[in-house]
Amino acid sequence: MSATVVDAVNAAPLSGSKEMSLEEPKKMTREDWRKKKELEEQRKLGNAPAEVDEEGKDINPHIPQYISSVPWYIDPSKRPTLKHQRPQPEKQKQFSSSGEWYKRGVKENSIITKYRKGACENCGAMTHKKKDCFERPRRVGAKFTGTNIAPDEHVQPQLMFDYDGKRDRWNGYNPEEHMKIVEEYAKVDLAKRTLKAQKLQEELASGKLVEQANSPKHQWGEEEPNSQTEKDHNSEDEDEDKYADDIDMPGQNFDSKRRITVRNLRIREDIAKYLRNLDPNSAYYDPKTRAMRENPYANAGKNPDEVSYAGDNFVRYTGDTISMAQTQLFAWEAYDRGSEVHLQADPTKLELLYKSFKVKKEDFKEQQKESILEKYGGQEHLDAPPAELLLAQTEDYVEYSRHGTVIKGQERAVACSKYEEDVKIHNHTHIWGSYWKEGRWGYKCCHSFFKYSYCTGEAGKEIVNSEECIINDITGDESVKKPQTLMELHQEKLKEEKKKKKKKKKKHRKSSSDSDDEEKKHEKLKKALNAEEARLLHVKETMQIDERKRPYNSIYETREPTEEEMEAYRMKRQRPDDPMASFLGQ
């Protein structure tokens, strides 16, 4: 069978350019091998022309043979080529061009008057089926009526972009959209010019420009500072400055003085740190960190509170910097006294130790103060009122009106909250909401539950309490039972007897179950004691054997000991500290 296959392959016609010889490859002679190697050397040196592939491209002679040799399954003709090393066209992905993009604003101009085969049975569009239709389900579909057929939706193309195409920020941008912005700016400029021309015409009609031109100082190039025309112009310029921001468009700055438009101008009025004092001997500026710790105005004689910038040193003393320094100082002092604490190694331990130290320090000061006062006295001098009240005069000037309000001076008022809740109205001494009872809010001073009521004081409290007593008496009278009939009394008696019988049965069951449980516990404890005695005996025998001859014994058990086993262990355990243990052993 193999011979017939070989004959059939040999008999097959071969094309001229792609002749495939299935004959056995002939072995190269020594002379042919030598000539081939010499030709390769000449090509590498550039003395012989390089090999050319089927596309007319030169093959680099320095490429190794394992790269340049063609596999038999790609090209059996064994022609010189590097096509197998290049990207294969059938495996290359097809990407969309940079000009392609999704279509926007596609109008549905096509009108369909007849149902088409394969369209949606509900609306008649060709782009989807009935189960994917978003239109409201019709009672009779477009397939059967043939009327009101919906137009086909525009199917957006599936765009596949390469690496650069995905990151192209201008892909899909229409340059014609920018013309709308240009037209808007042109309209604003035209409106400004129209307003300016209209103002000039009004001034010319009123004669202001003629008067200004005919003035003698204007002819000599001088201006009248106090003239009415200049005042009018100044007022107009002020109005233009006032409303210039309303006329501005984003990205431009309108200067009303120069009548020009400056676009994209960023005005920075802040001063750099290194420009505040140009003296080279002033505060040092570090360009790497952009920091200037010292005050640049230190040598200028200015007060640091008056200048806008006084250096970056204030940042070093803000936040927890001071407390951190105090904690570090405490750690050093504690380490000198033998305490092993460190700010970086044990920060939590140091913080707790420092807090306890501060508490003890305050307590020690208080105790020292109390002991001194107790020993020498003088507590009454510490409780004395301030010197202003003792002397009954102050240097604070206060001027009052006839109504009692302060006109000048400082008023020593009671510190109250800024909120409205602390406002006391209608002679109340407590605020609304200071008293609560039975789900209602009121005033604590009179127990009134009405917000805008007047305060009645203790009398109001007594009235509220008396009303509560009357209400309780009424409810107590209502709760008195009505007289019962003989039938109702008999039924209640039967119910009570049934309840008593049930209680007796339950008690009997409980007593019997308790006795059974005690017997079971006693038996379990007896078994546990026997097992514990056997274990102790086994341990005693094992300890008498030589250590090298003892058998393997594992103390590990997977189960947890029961309560009876623990009780037996406690009862049999030897206590050498007990003075009566020796008597019990005898």
UniProtKB/Swiss-Prot annotation:
Zn finger region (CCHC-type): 118-135
Record carries keyword Zinc-finger: yes
Keywords, alphabetical: Acetylation, Cytoplasm, Isopeptide bond, Metal-binding, mRNA processing, mRNA splicing, Nucleus, Phosphoprotein, Spliceosome, Ubl conjugation, Zinc, Zinc-finger
GO terms, biological process: cellular response to heat; intracellular protein transport; mRNA splicing, via spliceosome
Entry's localization field: Nucleus; Nucleus speckle; Cytoplasm
Annotated positions of the N-acetylserine modification: S2
Biased composition (Acidic residues): 235-248
Pfam families linked to this entry: Slu7 (PF11708)
Positions of post-translational Phosphoserine modification: S215, S227, S235
Cellular component GO terms held in the UniProt record: cytoplasm; nuclear speck; nucleus; spliceosomal complex
Cross-link annotation Glycyl lysine isopeptide (Lys-Gly) (interchain with G-Cter in SUMO2), location: K349, K408
Family: Belongs to the SLU7 family.
Domain notes: The CCHC-type zinc finger is required to retain the protein within the nucleus and prevent its shuttle back to the cytoplasm via the CRM1 pathway.
Entry function: Required for pre-mRNA splicing as component of the spliceosome. Participates in the second catalytic step of pre-mRNA splicing, when the free hydroxyl group of exon I attacks the 3'-splice site to generate spliced mRNA and the excised lariat intron. Required for holding exon 1 properly in the spliceosome and for correct AG identification when more than one possible AG exists in 3'-splicing site region. May be involved in the activation of proximal AG. Probably also involved in alternative splicing regulation.
Subunit comment: Component of pre-catalytic, catalytic and post-catalytic spliceosomes. Associates with the spliceosome prior to recognition of the 3'-splice site for step II, probably during catalysis of step I.
Name by which UniProt lists this protein: Pre-mRNA-splicing factor SLU7
Record organism: Macaca fascicularis (Crab-eating macaque)
